[in-house]
Amino acid sequence: MSLLDPRQFLLPAFYLDPSTQAFLTQAVSNHKLGTASSFRISDILEPSPNNSTYSHDLDPSPQSVRSDLSTSPRASSPDRNSPMSKKSRKARTIFTDKQLQELENTFEKQKYLSVQDRMDLAHRMGLSDTQVKTWYQNRRTKWKRQATSGMDLLSEPGNLSAVQNLIRSSPYWANYITALPMGGQMGQMPMMGLPMPMIVPPAQHFQATSSSNSPSTHKSSESPQLDVSSNSD
């Protein structure tokens, strides 16, 4: 005579015989019954490992995306070390002393060359037209810069020492002042748009002497006025 299980009298609706319980337990372990091993609320709400793995496969994390991008080769970006990526630089022309002297002499006479003159000069010197054109452009830029610095110095009234230094250091201004009419004297010299009255003697007579302020100098400067007045009488 077998013993009776008291649970069959207490909960007849939920009572299962031992063979049925064994079958259900084996089915749960084999098929996971919807991937949940128990019917507790916490176990039901907890995501299953299979679902989490599937979600990771569909939605990779940003960190994994960044790592894939960093490790993947960039086929579109060119190699910086390759010779094709480097810009080709033109070789700088090295002029001989004779060529430079002839270019300087031509520039002193003519600051701007026509196309025909430039071609003739290039042919005569054994250079290309582009080389002569480039040299003239650079030389004009230097010439304009020197002229601008000279204008800035001359715009200061009474700056005689600066003018002397400028003439000694710049051949352009020495030739410019020497070539002025009336013995190199300027009555009204416009500098930077403003008239600046000053008298500049020729470059070869630019010497700071102590006798410039002597009484004899004033007498010599006043003597033409005395002669003019005597002739008028």
UniProtKB/Swiss-Prot annotation:
A Pfam family matched in the record: Homeodomain
Species per Swiss-Prot/TrEMBL record: Caenorhabditis briggsae
Covalent S-S links between cysteines: none
Main function: Cell-type specific anti-apoptotic transcription factor required for the sexually dimorphic survival of the male-specific CEM (cephalic male) sensory neurons during sex determination. In hermaphrodites, the homologous cells undergo programmed cell death due to transcriptional repression of ceh-30 by tra-1, the terminal regulator in the sex determination pathway.
GO cellular component: nucleus
Annotated protein name in UniProt: Homeobox protein ceh-30
Organism lineage: Eukaryota, Metazoa, Ecdysozoa, Nematoda, Chromadorea
Compositional bias ranges of the Polar residues kind: 50-85, 224-233
DNA-binding region: 88-147
